[in-house]
Amino acid sequence: IIYQIDTALFYDLNGDGCGDIAGIAAKLRYIRRMGATVIWITPFYLTPFLDEGYDVSDHLQVDPRFGKLNDIIAFIEQARELGMQVIIELLIQHTSDAHPWFQQARRNPQSPYRDYYLWSDTDDDDTPPMFPGVEKSIWTWDDEAGQYYRHMFYHHEPDLNLASPAVLKEIENIIIFWLKLGVSGFRLDAASHLTKQAGRGDEKRGL
């Protein structure tokens, strides 16, 4: 039985108005008594939190509103002791525009990070955005970059270029990092968009 937990809403142990990892850990025995064998928690990564944490600015850091890295480690260990596994969200379709990768990409067209994202000199694309009531296009002009960048979701969530070997290596590093800390698996966010984007239509390239 998989029990999904919205990290920000589940249990606020420290009383700051936001649910936290320590709060989930405090309720582990209760969750186990309900019969859960797997806990799936929503994003807890460093984030501006403009999209409920799905706008990640660092995949290897815990956002302070949710706790610290040690809290995650302790939570995973406690869950394992109770016979439960932990799966987390793997967010690799896009990042926050506050992510250091994007900030470096937009500042310098020669930066190796430029290829981490999808850029264009025009916005001539009739692909509808995921949220047409909020976004008019999947392309947004960036003054500093001097180009448009693609975002299937919100303009503050630029799409990663999954055809880039460097991006795939970054994703591999993220996966390895969390597996070493004891997570048992991942829920792949926006999976349908990953296959459409990777290789930009070339099945021999990308994810």
Where are these regions (language model features)?
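Active-site and adjacent substrate-binding regions of carbohydrate-active enzymes
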Residues: 1-207
